[in-house]
Amino acid sequence: MLVRHILSLVFVTAGLAACRGGTDRTNGGDSPPPARASVDKDTEFGHEGLYTMELSLPDLPSKADPLRATIDRYVDRQKRAFMDSLDAPGARERARELPWDLNLDIAVASRTDRFINVQVDGSAFTGAAHPAAIVDSFTYDVQAHRVIGIRELFADPHGAEKAFAAEARRQLLTALDDQDEPLASDSEQIDAGTEPGKDHFRVFSLLTGPDNKVHGLTFIFPPYQVASYAAGPQAVDVPSDAFLTYLKPEYRGAFR
């Protein structure tokens, strides 16, 4: 049975403690998809100790060179934005008191013969009250040799997003009434954060089975999208039978 999961953000001075290790996600698991980084983290220290940048990247096959190029461009953008923030008035003075930090763990979360899914789990601390979470994903179509977004999987992307929204809302609204750990949110925030057509389902991973097929999708919502910052990012599993009819013909064989 596919159930809702909560991804816990554990913030330390350096930023977000990322999820590491484990195996590819399989259908019916009880924890979020573990990201697998196969290389040591590269750490760069800034001039005068103003900042630290920590980065880990996945090992990818040569057939996934377009995915590697996409990830490299993404990392460059994140680094530029982080460094640009040091040019703001008073930024360097604040960084001397408490050094800033960019932390990016980028790793393969799941793969099949058709797809390689990569997750980004990171944070940027730039002097605010707490680090800003960085939550992203990339899905590579091995046959088409290109990175695809969620809407590119579907002949009727709006219909698919309506199905995602219905299941996400059902699970998240149920979590509001959890007796042990109620979700720190409300129905208005959940509805707004899962509205179709607003790029709300951009970050996702694949629920894969032993048959090398995709059995469902896990949508990951960053802090503030459907719940409070303290609640951390939220993850909702949507089984494939909720959206199979909306898939493009060329992708139906990759799902079950």
Where are these regions (language model features)?
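Compositionally biased intrinsically disordered regions enriched in Thr/Gly
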Residues: R20-R256
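C-terminal motif of bacterial Sec signal peptides marking the signal peptidase cleavage site
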Residues: L16-A18
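Bacterial N-terminal signal peptides that target proteins for export
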Residues: M1-L7
